[in-house]
């Protein structure tokens, strides 16, 4: 199986118990995955040498559940007003309950039935607020390989009647901001598609999609997550690792609708305590 999209879809409610309630969890005798991918090489889009990624950042991909997360969200007016209304609905649905300002997040990774999902390396991820155990996000992650051999992250979020799937390409951050003194790289995960040099093909597979049954529609949404090891001097000053004691990774996550940025999330990751 090398499906781009998952078969999973939500009912009226998703919630933190989605995989259990839908009997999608893998049997207990199956090894549980630890991260969004098994190896960082599984996301090699053939645009740079992934072996140069800073090892602290690799932990986010390969051992995701071992990290605690602090999020600070900065909503852009008037989306900041609209979000307070939309968030009430999404709390009831139990999906995409992003912070208004700040949240401490716990992440759990599960083995799931890959036949039901339809993707060969799918795994479930549930993120909840540490203080309340309320769900923030429910997702099934896998990888996708296109006809040119480029690999992408395929992140599926069940929603009522279908799902939203982000096909994300792993890039390096260019310039001096993206490399430390030892040549180790910061990275970006992006849904912005592009044409690759020396190829006549149309733009690559990156994007965000609404998926309903066999139908998929490209959404007017884009996101980009830039990640640095906290020790990298090139990280943005706004991502001071002292904000969350023990931080090893910092990140900036921008989300856009029709090209207009509506929110920026700042992330601090540290080993679970």
Short names for language-model regions:
Residues 3-270:
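Soluble ligand-binding/transfer domains with enclosed cavities or grooves
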């Amino acid at each position: 199986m090398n499906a781009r999209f998952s078969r999973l879809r939500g009912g009226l409610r998703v919630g933190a118990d989605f995989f259990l309630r839908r009997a999608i969890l893998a049997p207990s005798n199956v090894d549980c995955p630890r991260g969004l991918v098994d190896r960082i090489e599984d996301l090699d889009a053939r645009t740079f040498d992934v072996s140069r990624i800073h090892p602290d950042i690799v932990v986010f991909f390969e051992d995701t559940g071992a990290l605690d997360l602090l999020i600070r969200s900065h909503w852009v007016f008037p989306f900041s007003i609209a979000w307070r209304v939309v968030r009430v609905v999404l709390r009831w649905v139990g999906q995409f309950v992003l912070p208004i300002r700040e949240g401490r997040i716990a992440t759990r990774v599960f083995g799931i039935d890959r036949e039901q999902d339809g993707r060969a390396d799918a795994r479930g991820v549930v993120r909840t607020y540490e203080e309340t155990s309320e769900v923030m996000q429910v997702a099934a992650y896998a990888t996708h390989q296109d006809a040119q051999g480029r690999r992408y992250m395929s992140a599926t979020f069940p929603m009522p009647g279908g799902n939203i799937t982000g096909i994300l390409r792993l890039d390096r951050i260019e310039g001096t901001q993206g490399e430390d003194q030892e040549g180790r790289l910061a990275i970006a995960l992006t849904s912005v598609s592009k044409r690759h040099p020396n190829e006549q093909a149309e733009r690559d597979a990156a994007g965000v999609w609404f998926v309903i049954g066999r139908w998929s529609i490209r959404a007017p949404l884009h996101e980009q997550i830039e990640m640095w090891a906290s020790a990298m001097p090139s990280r943005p000053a706004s991502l001071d690792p002292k904000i969350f004691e023990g931080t090893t990774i910092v990140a900036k996550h921008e989300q856009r609708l029709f090209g207009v940025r509506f929110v920026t999330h700042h992330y601090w990751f540290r080993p679970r305590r």
